[in-house]
Amino acid sequence: MYKHIKHTFQLRFFKIEILHKKQILKRRPNHGGFMETIYLAGGCFWGVEKFFKQFRGVLFTEVGYANGDGKEANYEDLWKSGHAETVKIEYDPSIIDLEKLLEYYFMIIDPLSVNKQGPDAGRQYRTGIYYTSNDQVKSIDKVVKKVEDELASKLAVEVEPIRNYKRAEEYHQKYLDKHPTGYCHIRNNMFHLED
């Protein structure tokens, strides 16, 4: 009888421990725990979000507006607020590290183009890497330098801490999942690198 009780207790404790770890994972995304967050601007955010969702280790994506002049931002007024269309990416660094994410990022942007990606032009379509902790800067600098060396040119990609981020309107979230034939400046085959 005691053996059964002990076994039941261990199973419950194990379930509680797993639940507790999931809560920590959700609660502490930016504090060196199981999950880290980076914000990437790469032109129209619909395609950038769909591109990053495919990778193992990417736990969550969301589109929004970042690094503008004020805290308020919406799709219609981006040209006034100075925000960039940005994708928030939460990832497990034990599965995919920041350097790998940035290597993928540079596969889908033109890093020399100022305020333009594909046919989309305007300050809201600029490229940017917006970090959440100083620990990320070393990895960012390493990848940026590598790309600059390969291109023999200074990049037009902003590298700054994240500020004034606002989640985009619901109709923009997972847009290309809801509208598979919707517009995207990223080639369709780029959405299947993990297949």
Model segments located where?
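Flexible coil/turn and secondary-structure edge motifs
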Residues: Y2-I5, F9, F13-K21, L25-D195
